[in-house]
Amino acid sequence: GTGGEFQPLGITKNKGVLNIDVTGLDAEYASSAGVLTAAFPNYLVASVLKNNVYADGLGFVFNTSVEQFFKSLRDNVGSFIFAKEMNDNGTLVGYPYRTTNLLETTGGKSSIIFGNWNDLVIGEQGALEIETSREGSWTDDAGNLISAFENDQTLIRAINNVDTGLRHDESFAVATKVAVPV
């Protein structure tokens, strides 16, 4: 989001977070098309650790296309570089990772986030709001309009306003324009 009212800023749009355009990196880490090398994960880790970040909650987040890309990387003799570690331990270069397709692949490009997830703060605004209605209606799974009034029912809706923020912006880095198989 934009960070405005009712739109969390999140990590990827936070101006204080290191943003790494992988298409501009040295060829040791990525090609100009954004195809990563096996050295890139350690580069991303080092870009965060150089900020003296606590190492108690470090990890990666990327989408499933990035995960499959890393699992398919091979060395010069054809052996998989990361597949065993990722499959057996759920780690990449020794750090845990999680996948989510909320980090989209658009035009064959995606993003990778690395950071100290203990520095991600989740906050609630106010208390849980409860609203009730005896006059409301809803549509059931079959497409029928159901009236609460006609069925002597009360509809209940719970609303909880939640936002995220970073305790230390320097605890995160976002790699962008990462080329992945679509």
Per-region residue spans from a language model:
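Alpha-helical scaffold segments that mediate packing/assembly in large oligomeric complexes
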Residues: 1-47, 179-182
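Short, catalytically relevant binding-site loops at active-site mouths
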Residues: 11-16, 66-68, 103-105
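Sequence/fold signature of self-assembling virion shell proteins
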Residues: 28, 36, 74-182
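Generic recognition of stable, solvent-exposed alpha-helical segments in well-folded globular domains
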Residues: 36-43, 61, 65, 151, ...
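Surface-exposed acidic, glycine-flexible loop patches that form ligand/cofactor-binding
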Residues: 49-53
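Generic detector of multi-pass transmembrane helix bundles and their immediately adjacent loops
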Residues: 60-69, 97
